[in-house]
Amino acid sequence: MKTIENHLSVHSNALNLRGKRNKILASNIANAATPHFKARDIDFDVEMRKKEKIGNISVNHEKHFALLSKVRPNDVMFREPLNPSLDGNTVEMAVEQMEFSENVVRYQTTLQFLTNKISVSYTHLTLPTSG
């Protein structure tokens, strides 16, 4: 039988990753006028596959920290600009705004899926059993 954590882990991992991506994209937009700022992003699909391979590692013994230190953080990449600016800044507002908007919609969709799963699970837990 799946635990609630396993039941919700894909959506919660996606929500966390989308939140991290929102912060990165917001930073890009905020630094659009900063000379030599390099636009950054993460590859959501690659990072989700990494999370699925790693799974949810629980720490219930002090020696488990050595294993956790080997887990790499999200790989942040630099975005290649279509039209490089003269000051070395690689932020292209149209691209960043489009990526941010798309990510926000996907974040909200993931949040809705997670909310629905929790609601359905709660309903199943509170239904009276027959017999």
Residue locations for each model-derived region?
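Extreme N-terminal "leader" segments
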Residues: 16, 24-27, 49, 53-58, ...
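Conserved small/polar residues in nucleotide/adenosyl-binding loops
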Residues: 123-129
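Amphipathic, heptad-repeat alpha-helical segments used for oligomerization and assembly
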Residues: 5-15, 75-113
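Long, charge-enriched, surface-exposed interaction segments in small proteins/subunits
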Residues: 45-46, 50-83
